Amino acid sequence: MKNKMLLMLSILFCFALADEFVDSKTTVGGYGELHYDMKGNDGDGKLDFHRFIVYFKHNFNSQWSLMSEVEIEHNMVGSESALGYKGGYVAMEQAYLNYWNGKWGFKGGVLLVPAGITNEYHEPPTFMSVERPEYNKYIIPTTWFDNGFAFYGTMSDFNWKVAFTGDLDGDAIGSGIRSARMKGVSSTTTSWTKTIQGSWTGMTGLKVGGSMTMNDAPTAAVAAVDAVPDSMNCGDDGMSECGNATDAVDAIAMGKVGVSLGEFNATYSAHNIYARMEYGMINYTDNPDGVESSSGYYVDLGYDIADLIGCGEDTNLYLWMRNSSYKKDDAGDAKDISLFGVTYKPMNNLSFKFEVGTAGDDDVMRMGLGYMF
């Protein structure tokens, strides 16, 4: 009885603390999405609650705030040996202090790399398709986040951002950078990942932008560089006095993989028309896999017919299509994607989606729902 009383008092105390610490300055949000994905060639369907995200924001005053986001993917988290199948994962995708004075700002902590449209704005109701564009998985991976800091601001209709985040993993770069994301785990700053982004919003409904991201991604061979002497006096007989200097020089050359990612994007949403496009290209130097570049694009076009069929003032019903193509290795074959879909939004923060089409050699059919708040 005494233990039950202590438990009840503890619960009441927690509610009292919640009233004390969670006030109007603290807000809670989030988003999530459920997918049904079937490839017509094999007839097997997959049902997956792909993402569940909780978002916390606290305003310390009118200029300083804390923003954070925690994600759970694929329902269950755990090792394959423990679950009997490959489980999902938990990640802290964002957690940063933010300063904004109306003209310019600063943020530091766990940040999203400001490259492309979808990496920064990937809540399910903000894009038409059930899944995020496949191009984004392999050319500009989403979600791409790391520890770092950024400065940003506005000048009339022009928005700018400069970000410095942790290195990519040079040993994991092959035909793409998706596997090279460190996600804030033991991040290094041998080169820093540097991103410059700009956008223009001077026309109603239109946003045009682009970015450049650069990093000399360190590899395991970086450790060998420390063993190279500051000077190599090999004497009259070549290598005899300094050992195998050639190996040392090779280690320096192999110590990094150069990555240069450029992208251009545009979005238009007005007068019942929806259009979005993005083109991205990655150039590599000293890539052990021999891949020199990766590139791709996608174009979405849609029209909101809700007014035509009397769906209601706050309702959207989009008929849309997507054309996309990407090459993880520009010396190889492209994967072409064509989709046709319907997206119903009973309100701006909810979406129900259906699409059919082709992805490479596969026929696909997908359904999904998503929310954000």
Task: Give the ranges of each region predicted by the language model.
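Outer-membrane beta-barrel proteins
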Residues: 39-43, 77-80, 115-120, 169-174, ...
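Detector for outer-membrane/organellar transmembrane beta-barrel domains
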Residues: 200-329
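Extracytoplasmic loops and strand-loop junctions of Gram-negative outer membrane beta-barrel proteins
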Residues: 37-39, 130-135, 177-182, 218-220, ...
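Outer-membrane beta-barrel "beta-signal"
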Residues: 151, 301, 362-373
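Outer membrane beta-barrel
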Residues: 20-39, 43-170, 190-208, 303, ...
